[in-house]
Amino acid sequence: MRVGPVRFALSGASQPRGPGLLFPAARGTPAKRLLDTDDAGAVAAKCPRLSECSSPPDYLSPPGSPCSPQPPPSTQGTGGSCVSSPGPSRIADYLLLPLAEREHVSRALCIHTGRELRCKEFPIKHYQDKIRPYIQLPSHSNITGIVEVLLGESKAYVFFEKDFGDMHSYVRSRKRLREEEAARLFKQIVSAVAHCHQSAIVLGDLKLRKFVFSTEERTQLRLESLEDTHIIKGEDDALSDKHGCPAYVSPEILNTTGTYSGKAADVWSLGVMLYTLLVGRYPFHDSDPSALFSKIRRGQFCIPEHVSPKARCLIRSLLRREPSERLTAPQILLHPWFEYVLEPGYVDSEIGTSDQIVPEYQEDSDISSFFC
């Protein structure tokens, strides 16, 4: 994956101009610009110039030059401490505007070009683990990549391309999709998941909300939020994690106290996603979590008549109670439904009003407390 440079804040106005500690050149052309800091003296002691370092820092080595961005307006707190007030802040060449609906995520506007990105903030001690999946994955058109990383004293600021809304919100607004559109979008979803699986990464908490539109036309999708994925070793994809969205959880996660196949669980989630795209509601739904999990354990669901036979076949091939009987992500891409629906001359059925729209769930929850 092509990754932009990590830039470390090096100096304030009193420091000499010089290159910062950057990504190795193999990862792209490093940016050699200074960042603002709130304590030039402290930064001078902590941040040696690249020419003073014995060797260039490894991409995932501990940060050698942390310092803070220009802080937002602050007020005096108890004990004389400063408390940041909500609102825009500035770091390097970016104006950060927090998104109310997404914690620790901001719109990032370049003050020179007007380019808009998304900025995620991570604790400096944990940012390496958070961005590791992005680094491990080879470049893919349906998976988001890192544009730039800026390191502060306490936080890492990771910049991504902006998006144009997520799939969950899109399906809620459309009720359900025609099969031709669903096939085009679902093929991109599966392609991203297959690429992750082939690169030793299991998604774990896979859901529609993790896929966002890359363009305003809403024809191109990309997978984002890889921070909570699982990096596996070899062919062993056994997981024991029970963290995720209840609507997408697979039966084996509910039925076992040990481990389960992470890839097979991802495929089950793909089945839930495809059903939701075509029907406009989840295959298993109940406001009571215990009742919901009982339905998932039984694995019984109804596919409406308007769904084509080939689409029904694919859904059933994904939502099998036995994990070993499910298709793999690469096998899904070979299913005849895609060719059938996407071939010229295909006529879709009329869109009707779904009797139940996709509900809002607590998307990021620990489901282990609901287990019997």
Swiss-Prot record:
Keywords, sorted A to Z: Protein kinase inhibitor
Skewed-composition ranges (Pro residues): 59-74
Transmembrane intervals: none
Record carries keyword S-adenosyl-L-methionine: no
PROSITE patterns, sorted: PROTEIN_KINASE_DOM
Stretches the record annotates as Disordered: 1-26, 49-85
Gene Ontology annotations of biological process type: JNK cascade; negative regulation of JNK cascade; negative regulation of lipopolysaccharide-mediated signaling pathway; negative regulation of MAPK cascade; negative regulation of neutrophil differentiation; negative regulation of smooth muscle cell migration; negative regulation of smooth muscle cell proliferation; negative regulation of transcription by RNA polymerase II
Motif, COP1-binding: chain positions: 355-360
GO MF: mitogen-activated protein kinase kinase binding; protein kinase inhibitor activity; RNA polymerase II-specific DNA-binding transcription factor binding; transcription regulator inhibitor activity; ubiquitin protein ligase binding; ubiquitin-protein transferase regulator activity
Any one GO cellular component localisation term in the record: nucleus
Function description: Adapter protein involved in protein degradation by interacting with COP1 ubiquitin ligase. Promotes CEBPA degradation and inhibits its function. Controls macrophage, eosinophil and neutrophil differentiation via the COP1-binding domain. Regulates myeloid cell differentiation by altering the expression of CEBPA in a COP1-dependent manner. Interacts with MAPK kinases and regulates activation of MAP kinases, but has no kinase activity.
Family: Belongs to the protein kinase superfamily. CAMK Ser/Thr protein kinase family. Tribbles subfamily.
PANTHER family per record: SER/THR PROTEIN KINASE-TRB, TRIBBLES HOMOLOG 1
Subunit structure and binding partners: Monomer. Interacts (via protein kinase domain) with CEBPA. Interacts with COP1.
Protein name: Tribbles homolog 1
Species assigned in the record: Mus musculus
